[in-house]
Each structure stands twice: as structure tokens, then as C-alpha cells.
Amino acid sequence: MPVALCAMSHSPLMGRNDPEQEVIDAVDAAFDHARRFVADFAPDLIVIFAPDHYNGVFYDLLPPFCIGAAAQSVGDYGTEAGPLDVDRDAAYAVARDVLDSGIDVAFSERMHVDHGFAQALQLLVGSITAVPTVPIFINSVAEPLGPVSRVRLLGEAVGRAAAKLDKRVLFVGSGGLSHDPPVPQFATAPEEVRERLIDGRNPSAAERDAREQRVITAGRDFAAGTAAIQPLNPEWDRHLLDVLASGDLEQIDAWTNDWFVEQAGHSSHEVRTWIAAYAAMSAAGKYRVTSTFYREIHEWIAGFGITTAVAVDE
């Protein structure tokens, strides 16, 4: 059955700290194109790779990868809250195949996800319940992180598993590109913040609002040039886009975790979701990128990209 891909950045600051209208119009046009691409493909199933931002996965038990057979959106930053329409049978089938491939992936019957999943689904298909999904969490913010080669192998294993489902599968990667938002690092965080990173589930409305306001303020400061966070790196972003489009994904195995941070910020690791999605596409054979959008958007603290791709018949 056919497969297709849409990889996209997300930002909780969309609609909260927006750039000038010309940039918004360009982003809106790119998402309009992506939505038409998805609608024309008409997926039976969306396999979505996304990170978490200490809203659903914490240091009390923090796997590098996790497949959800059921998932609940926490509704942060105004995203849709509630259960995703998860295809449980497909999730189990994918998990079994991935484990059989030698990739040690965790599995959850009660996964909690945040805007990394919800915003992508809402932007592409209108709702977290519009199309059955298999949500796959990839740790992208909480050190220690494994080598990116394992992410590529995970994606390939998921792609092989998806090919057996007899469904039209859309692979979605949500995150990145270069960005260094104010996400706390466990090694340097004060004790009270560490406790929240270990088990910060179910914050009060006031606690969540205060946390979100800090990020909004950071976005405003970053756009004004006064934030003490790492700059965006459009050269790095474009290099990543070129490598993913080339289909030669094994070269990514040489990229070190330190290199990601030095070049593109701590949260650049979110491009692991793109790497997994493209690797899943590669399991079906050659692919062709059909559209690419990229802009530096300081107000959203993100090198912001959107790409689509289709399989190429041999």
C-alpha cells in the first residue's frame, strides 16, 4: 500500500507571539499546501513521531522511544485535549515488528502527549481524532540521549512494519529545526525544578499558565535580541533538509549529540522525529520530496520547516 510523508516544525508560540504578517501568510500557505497534500493522499493511518516537553514523559521512567496503543493529549498551549484516535491493533503490530527487528522500544496503554503531537495533527488534519494514528514518542530533550543512528534504525523498522498493515500510511515527523527554547536541563536545574522534571504530571492551571507564560516571554525577548539563548542556525537547518531529501540517511549516523547542541541548540534534537519519519519512508524504497518550506522565525524560537514526500516507483 502507498506511503507518504509530511515533516513539520511545531511551536507553542504560534498565535501567541507571532511574526509580521508576511511571515504568517507564508507559513499559512505552506500549511495549506501540506493539508491538500495529506487530503489528496487520504491516509488510512497516520504514524506520527513527536517529542515531549515534560508534559507526558518524565525522568521517573524515561524511555528513548515509546509506541502508544492509547494516548491522551494534555491540551497545553491551547491545543486540543483528550484522547487521540489510536489504532490499537496497528500499534501492537508495529511494536511487535519493531521489537523483532532488535529495536528496544517501550510500549504504553496510557501515553500522555503534548503539543508536539496535538499541534501537528490539528494543523494537518484538523483534529487529534480526524484520522486513526499510531503515536510514537522519541525523547528529544531529556539527556542522556542515545545515538541518532538508533533513531534511523527505529524509523526503518517502523516503515517495514507499516508496509505489512495493508493501509495507506502517512508518516509525520513533528519538531525542530534549530532552536534552543528555555527547556530546563536536569543537570543544571535547581532542586524544585528537578522534582518537576521527575514527576510533573497534572499541574494546576496556574502552574501550567505560569510555565507557558515564561516561554511566551522568552519568545518575545528572543525576537527583540535580548534573550540569552542560542541563535537559530539556518545553514544547519538547510543542510539537514538537503540530507533528508537526498535519501542517503546513513550519513546521519556520524552526527554526534554534542554537534547537534553546538550547532543548533538543545532542542534541535527534535529533528530526530524528522529522521525517523524519513527513515520510515526509505523502508518502502526511494522517495521524492515534493515541497519544502523554510523560514527563520525568531518570534517562535524556531528554524521552521515543512516538507512533504512521496514514494518513487522503482
Swiss-Prot record:
Organism: Rhodococcus sp
Annotated EC: 1.13.11.16
Pathway participation: Aromatic compound metabolism; 3-phenylpropanoate degradation
Gene3D superfamilies in the cross-refs: LigB-like
Pfam family for this entry, one: LigB
Superkingdom, natural source: Bacteria
Sorted UniProt keywords: Aromatic hydrocarbons catabolism, Dioxygenase, Iron, Oxidoreductase
Name of this chain's protein: 2,3-dihydroxyphenylpropionate/2,3-dihydroxicinnamic acid 1,2-dioxygenase
InterPro entries: DHPP/DHXA_dioxygenase, Xdiol_dOase_suB
Catalytic center residues: 115, 179
Family to which the UniProt record says this protein belongs: Belongs to the LigB/MhpB extradiol dioxygenase family.
Function of the protein: Catalyzes the non-heme iron(II)-dependent oxidative cleavage of 2,3-dihydroxyphenylpropionic acid and 2,3-dihydroxicinnamic acid into 2-hydroxy-6-ketononadienedioate and 2-hydroxy-6-ketononatrienedioate, respectively. Also catalyzes the cleavage of catechol.
Cofactor(s) the protein requires to work: Fe(2+)
NCBIfam families, per database record: PRK13370.1-4
Record keyword Oxidoreductase present: yes
Complex formation: Homotetramer.
Signal peptide bounds: none
GO biological process, one term: 3-phenylpropionate catabolic process
One annotated GO molecular function: 3-carboxyethylcatechol 2,3-dioxygenase activity
Catalytic activity: 3-(2,3-dihydroxyphenyl)propanoate + O2 = (2Z,4E)-2-hydroxy-6-oxonona-2,4-dienedioate + H(+); (2E)-3-(2,3-dihydroxyphenyl)prop-2-enoate + O2 = (2Z,4E,7E)-2-hydroxy-6-oxonona-2,4,7-trienedioate + H(+)
